[in-house]
UniProtKB/Swiss-Prot annotation:
Domain-related comment: Comprises two domains: an N-terminal domain containing the nucleotidyltransferase activity and a C-terminal HD domain associated with both phosphodiesterase and phosphatase activities.
Subunit structure: Monomer. Can also form homodimers and oligomers.
InterPro entries: CCA_bact (IPR012006), HD/PDEase_dom (IPR003607), HD_domain (IPR006674), NT_sf (IPR043519), PolA_pol_head_dom (IPR002646), PolyA_RNA-bd (IPR032828), tRNA_CCA-adding_enzyme (IPR050124)
NCBIfam families the record matches: PRK10885.1
Binding-site positions, Mg(2+): 21, 23
Protein name, as recorded: Multifunctional CCA protein
Family: Belongs to the tRNA nucleotidyltransferase/poly(A) polymerase family. Bacterial CCA-adding enzyme type 1 subfamily.
Further remarks about this protein from its record: A single active site specifically recognizes both ATP and CTP and is responsible for their addition.
Pfam families to which the protein is assigned, alphabetical: HD (PF01966), PolyA_pol (PF01743), PolyA_pol_RNAbd (PF12627)
Tagged with keyword S-adenosyl-L-methionine: no
């Protein structure tokens, strides 16, 4: 009975990255031996145990055989005669098929260390194609390690494309697609995830609303990159630089979905694309079962992002109505989130990456002014029932108007 550190912990240590989770494989043991040693069994489908002290996961070495459709259609065989090499063979990528024994020796039967040096994400064996979830996992790894110069091996890319063409992605559940997407959105380069999916034709299967934006032109005056699909990924790149918030990054991804509905005869203009995109955001989020708070911000950003760009000329009444519409009084974080998504939209364009975005700062200032109006003072002044809300709104508009005269003076004449 021998334990080996495996997978991500070994990979990240070799890359000089912080190690978060440590997983272990145990060779030469039975479930009863693990229980006798004080381990707690947690795996239902195959034998996984928690260490009595560290609570880290220890899995018995196992092999897998395809026995059904999708990423759950596997029969596992775990027994003392399963070797470490056989266990590592079932892993997705060579850089994940690494192990380390107690004295620090690296066991690398499939060339993972060399691929780390080459910055390559390469599949371990043809069995890679038996699990459609791996298309998403590789896209996520590509995003996670893009800043280190990693790329996907051509033969792995070809295999991913073949899996998509064979309809394998139909076996993925919405929850798994969203889980991988959410994880990818936390990386430094989430745009790489979506670009990777597009490169292997998976984007049109999993995110048809985003794929539909490619080939849709926008006016060159405002969008030198012209293509709305390119612009979308540029805005996601910018959002990742501006905020670590998944809500902000996802809302930015979805901000221009309405442009995919514009009739070709009206190109390159997209009048009303914001409100038009709200239904597509709802559709995408319902299909992937995106959490409600993330969905709701994405809908608001789709509807109002262009309005923020015009903030210096907006009427005080319009600004206060905007705060009402986004429910800022109960969810004040939305003001900052919408400011960031609008900034990502403006700076996610060729040649505009370093642009200043004063509208974002002005939105936050206007919000501070509007929310500084005291509800207690309105009540103390004798207003009752519906009058309280009306007077509160009137005072907020007056306060924002006074602020706006100083901060956004309009030219005379």
């Amino acid at each position: 009975m021998k334990s080996y550190l495996v997978g991500g912990a070994v990979r990240d240590a070799l890359l000089g990255l912080p190690v978060k989770d440590r997983d272990w494989v145990v060779v030469g043991a039975t479930p009863q031996q693990m229980l006798d040693a004080g381990y707690q069994q947690v795996g239902r489908d195959f034998p996984v145990f928690l260490h009595p002290q560290s609570r880290e996961e220890y899995a018995l070495a196992r092999t897998e055989r395809k026995s059904g459709a999708g990423y759950t259609g596997f029969t596992c065989y775990a027994a003392p005669d399963v070797t470490l090499e056989a266990d590592l063979l079932r892993r997705d990528l060579t850089v994940n098929a690494l192990a380390q024994d107690a004295d620090g020796t690296i066991i690398d039967p499939y060339g993972g260390q060399n691929d780390l040096r080459l910055r390559l994400l390469r599949h371990v064996s043809p069995a890679f194609s038996e699990d459609p979830l791996r298309v998403l996992r590789v896209a996520r790894f590509a995003a996670r390690y893009a800043h280190l110069g990693f790329r996907i091996a051509e033969e792995t890319q070809a295999l991913m494309h073949a899996m998509v063409e064979a309809g394998e992605l139909a076996h993925l559940t919405p929850e798994r697609v969203w889980k991988e997407t959410e994880s990818a959105l936390t990386t430094r380069n989430p745009q790489v995830f979506f670009q990777t999916l597009r490169d292997c034709q998976a984007l049109k299967v999993l995110f048809p609303e985003i794929d539909a934006l490619y080939g849709v032109p926008a006016p060159a005056k405002w969008h030198p990159e012209i293509d709305t699909g390119l612009h979308t990924l540029m805005t996601v790149t910018m959002a990742a630089m501006l905020s670590p918030d998944v809500d902000v990054r996802f809302a930015t991804l979805c901000h221009d979905l309405g442009k995919g509905l514009t009739p070709k005869a009206l190109w390159p203009r997209h009048h009303g694309h914001g409100p038009a995109g709200v239904k597509l955001v709802e559709q995408l989020c319902a299909r992937l079962r995106v959490p409600n708070d993330i969905r709701d911000l994405a809908k608001l950003v789709a509807e109002y992002h262009d309005l923020i760009h015009t903030l210096p000329i907006l009427q005080p009444k319009t600004l206060v109505k905007l705060f009402d519409s986004i429910d800022a009084w109960r969810k004040p974080q939305r003001v900052q989130q919408i400011a960031l998504t609008s900034e990502a939209d403006v700076r996610g364009r060729t040649g505009f990456e370093a642009s200043d975005y004063p509208q974002g700062r002005l939105l936050l200032e206007a919000w501070e002014v509007a929310q500084s109006v005291s509800t207690k003072e309105v009540v103390a002044a004798g207003f009752k029932g519906a009058q309280i809300r009306e007077e509160l709104t009137r005072r907020r508009i007056a306060a924002v108007a006074q602020w706006k005269e100083q901060r956004c003076p309009q030219p005379q004449g």
